[in-house]
């Protein structure tokens, strides 16, 4: 997630209730907040498990919340605290707050010329729907979703719901609040009862000309390429990249963090891990 206005480290510390020890210095502000899979230079990220220390410290992230004393890599700032995840979530929740909506279509939503919105459709804040689309009854389009031209979404599908992303702790599951977005490109058709989760901090993207059957689940931060065909009851986990012109037949399951090459065909009931 990009910040509308970059912030300084002292301003960041005002958003976090924990004690933070700052190590390192750079000459530019914090420009966004992102999880490991989508970090860029200038981003704030976090790490709280030794399995990921090297990956996060070696990533593009410039500002890192961490729960361990560690040599400061060149060009980075370490923000040492007891609980990096909760510090990270405090920052997310400062920028992303749930606001109840009492209209079916948010006043600032943008609906293109020739688009048909059927009864009982919900469209959230900062949503853009392109021209000549058909959005069928009972579709829910969550905030911060962008839909291209000539897109068809069939009844009861949900676009841009929160990621299913939690950390197990002694007191129960802690949710990673989602601050990412969803992009549906031109000429996509989405069947009935499909669910496409928004990015945790990045983008979930469905490429131009791709077609979904019914009951498809797409996890957070996943990229589906152009002209793909996804059969009924396919489930694709988060942070996976499906390249262009792939065909995935019914009830296939694809795990997280994978790359599926162009023109791949996945047969029905397959499991890819």
Please tell me what each predicted stretch does.
Residues 46, 104-273:
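Structural signal for interior beta-strand "rungs" in well-ordered beta-sheet cores
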Residues 1-108, 114, 150, 156-157, ...:
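Terminal amphipathic alpha-helical/low-complexity segments used for targeting or macromolecular assembly
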